[in-house]
Amino acid sequence: MRIEYLKTAPDRMGRYTLGLEDGSKLLLYRQTIEDFGLYTGLELTQEQYKRLLAAVSEMSAKMRAVRIVSAANVSKKDLENRLVQKGEDPAQARKAVSWLSELHLIDDSATAETIVRACIAKGYGRSRARQVLYEKRIPRELWEAALEDYPDQTEKIADFLRAKLKGSQDPKLQKKAIDALLRRGHSYGAIRQALSELSLDTDDFPEEE
């Protein structure tokens, strides 16, 4: 397999385009070019071509993995899933995740703690935080440690109710605010306590459900 051309300028992702005699193209990172000693006119044996394809696939998965973890907090499972969804080979996706883990660039425990801190900052209740951990594919055995110091949300709930109700006793307005709090993952008990602190009627409000 002959290399017809190898562009000298990379694209915006840092990849160089290599054209082969059969009309196919490969997008290569500089490291792969140097590892294989590639240049225009080089004749590749079938074995070399096979190894080149494997190296291109491996490097593609690794570089995409780096971009993903640089832009978002992801778990290992979430990262692997995203890589496959983006078209990376499943085996190479797993290898890329292991590679980042070995470099300590992805850590499910640290990611879980970051997610929980973000949930607290957004005023979410504990159950909503658990839902986010599930959605991010954080292993369940890490949940309790991440949630261990979840603060009491009564004051935040009360602040939310003050802002939404503005002193109104309108049952419909109260229900709307309470429904919003439930969607945020706050328990009936926590909401009831906040209602009591604001001297709002809780007679028909369940303590838990």
Give the ranges of each region predicted by the language model.
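An alpha-helical, amphipathic repeat domain used for nucleic-acid recognition
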Residues: M1-E209
